[in-house]
Amino acid sequence: MQMNYTKWLDSSFLEKKEKEIIFELSEKEKNECFSGYLEFGTGGMRGIMGLGTNRMNKYIIRKATQGLSNYLIKTCGETGKNKGVVISFDCRNNSSDFALETALVLCANGIKTYLLSSLRSTPELSFAVRELKCQAGVMITASHNPKEYNGYKVYWKDGGQLVEPEASGIVSEVNNVDEFLDVKIISKEEAISSGLLNILNDELDEKYLSYVKNESVLNISKKDFKLVYSPLHGTGGRPVKKLLNDLGYSVFVPKAQEFPDGNFPTCSYANPEEKNVFDLSIKLADEVGAEVCIANDPDADRTGMMVKYKGEWIYLNGNQIGILLLDYILKNSKNIPKNSAIASTIVSTPMLDFIAEDNNLKIFRTLTGFKYIGEKIREFEEGKYNNSFLFGMEESIGYLKGTYVRDKDGILGAMLLTEMSCYYKGIGLSLIHI
C-alpha cells in the first residue's frame, strides 16, 4: 500500500488539488484506496470512484485503455487500428469524462475512435461495434451498482463482451502498464484535428431501434392498454419511450425517475431485481389504471417487471419472465426455423429444457454471464453447430431475441414485455394466468 501511496503523492502527473486530497486521507482510507490495483478482470473492471490505485479514476481508466491499445495493436496491427474502437457511457457521475479519457488514449496510440456524444445504453454500444465494423468497443458503466461505483467493459469485434483468448490477453497487457509512465495521451483538440476522433451524435439511434422493432412478434391492438415504464434515472428513458410511443402504446413514466441522474435520488440501488425500485411506478400505475410496470437498470441491458393481479402487485423474477417470453415467442412467431436453438446459463431455470424438448428445439447451456450466450451466437454463425439462434436468457433479468446485438438488451426486453402483456390483456388474460 505504502509504495503505491508514495508513488502517487510524488508523481508529477497528479494535479496539486489531487495530491492535497491524497495527503489528507486517513490510514484506513489509504489502505482502501491504495492496497493493490483495481482488478481488471476478463469482463473489465468495476469499483468505487476516487483517487488511488484501487479506485475508478482517470489514471486507472488510462491504464486500462493503454493495455487494450497494446493488445489491439499487437494482435490486429494496422487493420485493427483502422477498424477502431467505439465508446459509449451511461448516466453515472464521471461517465462522460471517463469515456473521453478512454478516447484520448486510443487516439494517442493511432487507433481510430468513435465517441458517442451523449449517454447511450449498453445494447446500443454492442450494436455500434457491429454496425461500424469496429475491432472493439468500450462501455463506461457499473450497471445497477450504487452511485459511488463506475466501471469499464470491453467488447470485441462481434459486439460481444470479451471471451477467450482476447479476455486473458487484454488482462495481461493491462497488468503490465504503469498508469503514469507507460500511458500515451493527447488532447481532445489534437485527437479531432488528427482525424482519429469521430464524435457520433444520433446517427445510430434510429437504425438500432429499427432492429429492435423487427423483433416484435405480433402487431396487436393497443386499445385500453396502459403501461408504466421507469428507466430508474438511467439511459433507457429516451429510447424506450420513443420505441413504445412509435408502436402506439400508452406509456406513463414516474417524473422523479424519468431523466438521467447518476446520484439515483429515488433508489440507492437501481436494480430492477429489487421490488422497492417499483414503488413510484406502482403509485403511478394505480393512479392511471395501468396493470403492468416495467423498469430497466441504468445502462438498460436488463428488464424487470411487476404485474397487478386481483388488486395485488406481483413481482416476476428473471426465470419467470424468460419462460413467459419464450412461450410467447414460440406460440406466436411464424416460420421459426427447424434448427432454432435457445441459449441460457447453467444457473437459469430447468423449465427451459422441457420447453425446448416439447418444441423440438436444441438448448445450449453456458457458464454464468451473458457474454457466453453471445459467444454461442457467434459459434452458430461460424457453423460450429447446425443451429440458428432464437432466444437467450439469464436468470438475472437479461434477455435477447435476434442477433443484431451480442448482449442482453433491456430496450428489446421492455418492448417484448409490453407487447406480451398487451396481447394477453386483449384475450382476457393476465401474465399470472399463463
Task: Describe the residue ranges of each PLM region.
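N-terminal small/polar loop signature for handling phosphorylated ligands or for N-terminal nucleophile
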Residues: 78, 86-149, 245, 250-305
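Conserved phosphate/anionic-ligand binding catalytic regions in large, soluble enzymes, centered on
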Residues: 34-54, 143, 231-239, 298, ...
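Active-site phosphate-binding/coordination module
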Residues: 124-182, 298, 309, 395
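Mobile "lid/hinge" segments at catalytic clefts and subdomain interfaces of large enzymes
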Residues: 397, 406-430
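An N-terminal, well-structured beta->alpha segment
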Residues: 4-102, 109, 191, 197-227, ...
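Gly/Ser/Thr-enriched, mixed-charge loops and adjacent short helices
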Residues: 29-38, 150-277, 284-285
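Conserved small/polar residues in nucleotide/adenosyl-binding loops
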Residues: 432-434
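Proline/glycine-rich low-complexity loops and linkers
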Residues: 117, 177-200, 309-391, 399-401
